[in-house]
Amino acid sequence: MATRIEFHKHGGPEVLQTVEFTPAEPAEHEIQVENKAIGINFIDTYIRSGLYPPPSLPAGLGTEAAGVVSKVGNGVEHIRVGDRVVYAQSTLGAYSSVHNVTADKAAILPDAISFEQAAASFLKGLTVFYLLRKTYEVKPDEPFLFHAAAGGVGLIACQWAKALGAKLIGTVGSAQKAQRALDAGAWQVINYREESIVERVKEITGGKKVRVVYDSVGKDTWEASLDCLQRRGLMVSFGNASGPVTGVNLGILNQKGSLYATRPSLQGYITTREELTEASNELFSLIASGVIKVDVAENQRYALKDARRAHEVLESRATQGSSLLIP
């Protein structure tokens, strides 16, 4: 028997349940992974709450984990039993001690990277890869705005931007988070609880503002993000932490300077095995060399059965960096 987290109705963290189950055999082109560390991501709360509803209920949760391959389905040639792997684009159900995953969605994990490092960074790192390298390729010495700079994605973005020589201006909600972002490589930070984001961006850039804004907050920062952009700048809306952006009048993009806006996703940028290999190789290289550090605080590691508590803390915005479930 194995253990997983399920929910039978949408709602708050209280809907999460721990259940025992018998894992199915891996189908063709699938592998079965004994998870050693499971990534917790904000998108998991959207699925649980019903903002991004699963196809049916009851449903599992989570798409990211790292572990050891225990079984291999027919047609899988590049992964073997015993391989250390990490994945971030599985079907729902990674909040589990055992999970079946499409083989092409898993990457072989280098020995230099632990299961905990991998599960804490893979989805977030792949996200930063497509944001900074594909959606808009930030350039050396180029200032840009990145919201939630002390979150799991944000801290990796701070480190990656520094490695690229770019100047990340990060928004944060406390002095402690400001220091965390600066330590990770942010060029400047803005405490949105105490400062005007727009006025500070203008001040930092000498009135020029920025070419690109990366916004995972959603409705609360939409207008401010647009006001931080230069003429013909790009608004990259990639999350809804404060709720989705709805009812947008496209005319506002004209009014604020012929702006561009995009709503990218990981699946839109990393779909094929070749795309996953390109992204994961770059991420693994940065982690293995110590350029990107993804150590998880002890108080943000939870037993699998404590997923409910992990979600409560995540949604309270009390976390810094990544959180993990340990089966």
UniProtKB/Swiss-Prot annotation:
Pfam family, one: ADH_N
Gene Ontology CC terms, in alphabetical order: cytosol
UniProt-listed PROSITE patterns: QOR_ZETA_CRYSTAL (PS01162)
SMART domains named in the record: PKS_ER (SM00829)
EC number of the protein: 1.6.5.5
Disulphide bridges: none
Enzyme class: oxidoreductase
Keywords: NADP, Oxidoreductase
Reaction it catalyzes: 2 a quinone + NADPH + H(+) = 2 a 1,4-benzosemiquinone + NADP(+)
Quaternary assembly: Homodimer.
Protein name, per record: Quinone oxidoreductase
Gene source species: Salmonella typhimurium (strain LT2 / SGSC1412 / ATCC 700720)
Gene for this chain: qor
